[in-house]
Design a protein with these regions (language model features):
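Short, conserved beta-strand element in jelly-roll/cupin
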Residues: 40-42, 52-67
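Conserved short histidine dyad/triad with adjacent acidic residue
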Residues: 22, 36-52
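A short, N-terminal "cap"/entry segment at the start of jelly-roll beta-barrel domains
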Residues: 1-33
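Conserved catalytic-core motifs of eukaryotic protein kinase domains, centered on the activation segment
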Residues: 51, 71, 95
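Short, surface-exposed secondary-structure edge patches
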Residues: 38, 57, 72-74
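Short acidic-glycine-tyrosine-enriched beta hairpin
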Residues: 71-86
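Ligand-binding loop in jelly-roll beta-barrel domains
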Residues: 86-101
Length: 101
């Protein structure tokens, strides 16, 4: 974890910024039991289908995400969360607009 963010109130919107035609990530906590990573997806960008050996929570903090879990598409908007179950294939896309999570 970056020392500059410990024990401070942070503006979650400013932890990661959009960049044209790419996905930007910032890992803020990395522990043996899990990580906390912020992402900014430009429109049209995403993460291809994959799975993980643990549950993962996505909280959309700006925009709107299309998240596919085991073939079922979900639209998740700013202020909403979704839990992606362990070992289930999932993918994330910025279809209609950029988003941060």
């Amino acid at each position: 974890m970056s020392e500059d963010i410990k024990a401070k109130a942070l503006d979650i919107q400013k932890l990661v910024e959009y960049q044209d035609d790419t996905v930007v990530s910032r890992e803020v906590i990395k522990k043996e039991l899990g990580t906390v990573t912020f992402f900014a997806f430009d429109q049209g960008q995403g993460l291809s289908e994959h799975s993980a050996p643990f549950d993962a929570m996505v909280q959309v903090i700006d925009g709107e995400a299309e998240i596919t879990i085991s073939g079922e598409k979900h639209t998740v908007k700013a202020g909403e969360i979704i839990i992606m179950p362990a070992n289930e294939p999932h993918a994330l896309q910025a279809v209609n607009c950029p988003y941060k999570m």
